[in-house]
Amino acid sequence: MNCKNRFRINIWLFLIITFAGCTDNDIPQKENDIAPKEEPTPPKEDAEESLFDILNLDYSGLEEVKALYKAGDNDAAMQKLLVYYQNRTEILNPNLSATLNETEQGYADYAINEYRFYVNDNYLEDKTRKIPYSLQNNDKTINWEFAPKGADNEYQKQLHRHNWMPLQGKAYQNSHDEKYVLSWKEVYTDWITKNPKPNGKPDKFKWYQLQVSTRIMGQTESFEYFKSSPNFTSEWLSFFLIHFAEHADYLSLYKYAGENNILLSQAVALVFAGTLFPELKNAPQWQKTGCDIINEQTTKLFLKDGMTNDLSLHYHIGIVDGLYDLKRLIQLNKLPDNLLSPELDNVLLKATKVVMHFTYPSYFTKGSKNCSPAFNDSWIKTRSVLNKNFVKYAEMYPDDSELNYMKTYGKGTPPDSKIKTFEYSGFYVLRNGWTPQSTMLVHSNNISSKLEDSSHNQLDNGTFELYHNGRNFFPDSGVCSYMKENDTEVMELRRWFRQTKAHNTMVLGQSEEHEAIGSENINKAQGKLVLSEENDNQQLIVTENQGYGNFKHRRAIFYVKKPVEFFAFVDEGFGTATGYSKLYFHLCDETSTNNVNLDIQEAGAHTTFEDNNNLIIRSFGNQDITLKPFDGRISYQTDRKYSVRKAYSLIMEKKKNAPVRYITILYPVTTASNHKINATFTDNTSNSDNVSIEVTIDNETYSLNYQL
């Protein structure tokens, strides 16, 4: 080409022959699986933009590239640039790893089989065999508008994050099979051609900030995995760099409006782009923009108690992980320490301790799958997932004995077992130890002004989960679906799991019956801690929330450790409201339906597990209580599927200016038979700041009280 100052490549894409199949070492295939076809030929790689317009030819190491370009030998300059990148060793990406498990290897191969692109584990055509949906049209082209029947918006959003591409890069590193490179080139070229950058603000799906951020992070990995391939040509390098810069420029131009995980992912991606591709002209600006966002948002994204403002442990862990990656990026590439605020270290340490205190003692049992609560838009974390994070936390803070205890599955001195209050996010933890046989209760009383359907926090009004001796007796209902505004069925599912009565808490209704989805929801989530006390034998927290304009829920939780272990809940509803108060309880999960018995006459329930790990629940009130069974639900995937479990509500009439008051006893036992439980109020009902109760369990009486 004879243009000295500009090098142009014209985009010209033709159809590629597709191929399919897995190797003998991949996920087993049934006999009716589609047989492999011929491998594709690589696309013609042309583009209409100038590579040399986006390069900083004065960057150290590009001297020969610059000389060849100045001499008008653009082909040679491009070839020299490719050699430079292939031999570059001083720029280090902390996320690189050739480790690939069997499932990930399968996803790398399925991307070649009828364009079966891995989106996430919730969107699989065959969940048992881990087979993603196919995006192949009848004419063998890719349908980027595809979404499975009934899927919410997340499928299309996450499809455009290209999560399968780095997996193909890892597969290439392990096999050096060129089919992975050819697939990557073909599919990415097709995506770029069919999904051009918007002329203005980000759209909702393809060029939404989180999608762009994730693509940038993935491409920084794919580039390194594939760059040694003979099919990684100088023309492809040009195509890749032009569109990588296009992504980073666009992301730096449109800062996400919310102060949450999406904005943080945007910032991290920009710092990665600017650091890992410093040869590009705008790299310093990308890096600075990303660091500025992080420094500005650190105290906004993280609340003073260490929890992130989404109030979701799932997103919290992801945010901490992104900042861990960022710190490693800065350390490995010897960037100046002052790029990030000195506050970040202290904020991150607090954030790691949130994860630690939210971890159930089952974490210390090999193979455990249920090791965390799942409040709000969150999912239960397994032992292995949590440990990977604790290893990173201990790396960031090597002198912290608590994080090292978690990293090593219990070697050393455990954290203390005192009450942990996270007052700014509304979470509270009571426990008696850190062994698998321990007891731990997590109380959630959300503090958030975001109550709309799209919010990650739910309308809980003071719910809880209770872990005892390896079993979660009150797991949260979970999340069944994300958003899809124009799909009534999807939105009904999302609203069912978000509604207040889907939690272990109190609602205000207008009838004695279970009312329509969302009709009894609180309209304000400003949970407040009003008291916290403890001694060697007992822990107490008292919280409240003015969830309705004329009805306030106050919940006291007494945890009696000695001489007999039990919990006493005092739930009170104050205000001028009239109607019916309903105290909901949702027990165990779908696998335990036959082990949960509702005791209607005793206003409670009990479990009948054969492992001698059971619970009796009994409630008492300041007036008559009616127990109504309720079809509870539980779901920890956003695949619009759920299981039914046992639940119930305890109903009292709410009269004007008269409080409703419940006492609920949770008593861990080996078997539920032959136990007698009673509880009564012994205080002056005219003084709402004074609570005194007597609890009698098997002829032993315990006096519990607090004064505000």
In which residue ranges do the predicted regions lie?
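Extreme N-terminal leader/anchor segments
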Residues: 40-127
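Carbohydrate-active enzyme catalytic cores, enriched for enzymes
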Residues: 303, 307-473, 655-657, 661, ...
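Bacterial signal peptide processing site
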Residues: 23-25
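Cytochrome P450 core scaffold surrounding the K-helix E-X-X-R motif
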Residues: 474-477, 483-486
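Bacterial N-terminal signal peptides that target proteins for export
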Residues: 2-11
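CBM-like, beta-strand-rich accessory domains located in the C-terminal region of large
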Residues: 213, 485-708
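Aromatic-lined, polymer-binding surfaces characteristic
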Residues: 141, 146-351
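C-terminal motif of bacterial Sec signal peptides marking the signal peptidase cleavage site
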Residues: 19-21
